[in-house]
């Protein structure tokens, strides 16, 4: 079902290329290096920015007690031989904007980045972070021609972390004790699975009333917008970088973590030809398997509504191309 690339680079020192040296990209570079996961190549089109950030991170190595190599560059040739390519390049949201409003501007950026990166790292696994996430992942999949296990979007890990955070704040408990999962698109139609959320194994339905749970679900759906409205000058970057580094870690260390990941579906959940967030097992080959949960009728309906919104934006992009 899933391909296993016969790649010589899997036997080399691990290297992660990050395309886009903005706040998410640069914070992700820091996370990966300081967790001692891999060497990092940070690429951006603006001269001096990735080089300066790389030097800054290099100067912190002695303090952070690691010896990872960090390169800043404007040349895709320097990303050659990367095991993982993370695409964060693109314009961030501004107050009042939805993730879908970024479609026209960011699609061209992501497609070009994907084509350039795959030319130098043909065996790499790709993680897309740029918004609108699900559509950008679909376009990157088309641009690279990769098997679906080697290209994925980071959304569900972040959305699940937000849901867990709001549950923990409501109950006054340790966030690490809260486990939750959010499926669907990375937007207003995401599907937080309340009945699967637990605190140390106790379902939150036994700890919180239905009205409170629905309030936390709605806050989760608007979690990104809440930060954009507060900051006024951009969106979240600490939590997105942490969520992406968790995916990188699971792949490089072959941890087989079960995480919600945006993937091209081929019939799972009765959905086809769409990228959307579902539970997946992440390991050395990227997405090792897709897990099909036993969803209720209302959960399945919500997932399908979410998928239709992604398909609508894919068609919107195609119409823009033809206009």
Curated annotation (Swiss-Prot):
Record-listed E.C. numbers: 1.1.1.37
CDD domains in the record: LDH-like_MDH
Alphabetical GO biological process terms: lactate metabolic process; tricarboxylic acid cycle
GO molecular function: L-lactate dehydrogenase activity; L-malate dehydrogenase (NAD+) activity
Swiss-Prot/TrEMBL catalytic activity: (S)-malate + NAD(+) = oxaloacetate + NADH + H(+)
InterPro entries according to UniProt: L-lactate/malate_DH, Lactate/malate_DH_C, Lactate/malate_DH_N, Lactate_DH/Glyco_Ohase_4_C, Malate_DH_type3, NAD(P)-bd_dom_sf
Pfam families in the cross-refs: Ldh_1_C (PF02866), Ldh_1_N (PF00056)
Protein residues bound to NAD(+): 20-25, 44, 106, 129-131
Active site: 186 (proton acceptor)
Disulfide pairings: none
Sorted UniProt keywords: NAD, Oxidoreductase, Tricarboxylic acid cycle
Binding-site list for substrate: 93, 99, 131, 162
Source species, domain of life: Bacteria
SUPFAM superfamilies to which the protein is assigned, alphabetical: LDH C-terminal domain-like (SSF56327), NAD(P)-binding Rossmann-fold domains (SSF51735)
Its job: Catalyzes the reversible oxidation of malate to oxaloacetate.
Entry similarity comment: Belongs to the LDH/MDH superfamily. MDH type 3 family.
Protein name (database record): Malate dehydrogenase
Lineage per the UniProt record: Bacteria, Bacillati, Cyanobacteriota, Cyanophyceae, Nostocales
